[in-house]
């Protein structure tokens, strides 16, 4: 019920194909809101449905794993025909999505005072990420996913950041090759989420699709150095 505003957007558009909610709030209750969720979904032509037992849906996915799904209206199609339509959609395994979400042109996010310079390879980067770097004195040059190692090195960065993003890391052979070339040049590289998996593949590791994706803000992770369990936020379907 917090509504919608342009300041908090992590991207210039909604990327999900559909939205499911049990009980949508009939009111928007936040002083920063400039529109409501329903209005924004309509503006961006995102299919949405309410009145769904999302708890039962969650239990179903918990027991059977992530799966393709469709949202249908009307009675033109039978249940069997709906299933056929859903199965036409591409599975996440083998999906190459970086080209759809990456920036087309490079751009720079400047800090008040520059301590370091980092090149961020945009595999689906969130808007808050370069802003967070800038708040810490890091000048960030965000570049398209298909930027070459030579083009990155020409910017003379102190490090290269591999962003988060959607899709199957096993499809990113060209980006993996770029990262390997940068590693051979001893350029410091770090990544999160999808970018972390790309870095792993560049170092010779394999990735695979999880039957149950890790989603949520309360995922426990054991730090083997300290023996302590940290509560972390996860949102990934591959490991």
Model-derived segments and spans:
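Cysteine-nucleophile active-site neighborhood
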Residues: 154, 159, 163-237
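RNA-binding accessory domains that recognize and position tRNA/RNA substrates
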Residues: 1-150, 154-155, 169
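Generic "edge-of-domain/loop-turn" microfeature
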Residues: 26, 76, 228-229, 239
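Generic structural signal for residues positioned in beta-strands
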Residues: 18-20, 70, 100, 206, ...
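Short Gly/Pro-enriched loop/turn and capping motifs at secondary-structure junctions
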Residues: 126, 237-239
């Amino acid at each position: 019920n917090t509504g919608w505003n342009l300041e908090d957007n992590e991207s210039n558009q909604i990327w999900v194909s559909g939205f499911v909610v049990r009980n949508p709030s009939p009111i928007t209750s936040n002083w920063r809101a400039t529109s409501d969720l329903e209005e924004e979904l309509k503006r961006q032509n995102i299919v949405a449905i309410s009145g769904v037992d999302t708890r039962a849906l969650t239990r179903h996915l918990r027991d059977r794993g992530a799966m393709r799904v469709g949202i249908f209206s009307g009675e033109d199609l039978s249940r069997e025909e709906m299933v056929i339509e859903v199965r036409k959609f591409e599975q996440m395994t083998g999906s190459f999505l970086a080209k759809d979400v990456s920036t087309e042109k490079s751009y720079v996010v400047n800090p008040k005072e520059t301590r370091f310079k980092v090149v961020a390879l945009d595999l689906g980067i969130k808007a808050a990420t370069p802003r967070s770097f800038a708040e810490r004195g890091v000048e960030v040059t965000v570049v398209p996913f298909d930027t070459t190692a030579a083009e990155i090195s020409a910017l003379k960065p102190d490090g290269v950041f591999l962003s988060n993003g959607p899709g199957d890391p096993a499809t990113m052979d060209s980006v993996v090759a770029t990262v390997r070339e940068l590693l051979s040049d001893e350029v410091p590289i770090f990544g999160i989420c999808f970018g972390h998996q790309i870095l792993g593949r560049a170092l010779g590791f394999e990735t695979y699709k999880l039957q149950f994706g890790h989603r949520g803000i309360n995922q426990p992770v054991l730090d083997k150095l300290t023996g302590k369990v940290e509560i972390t936020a996860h949102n990934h379907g591959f490991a």
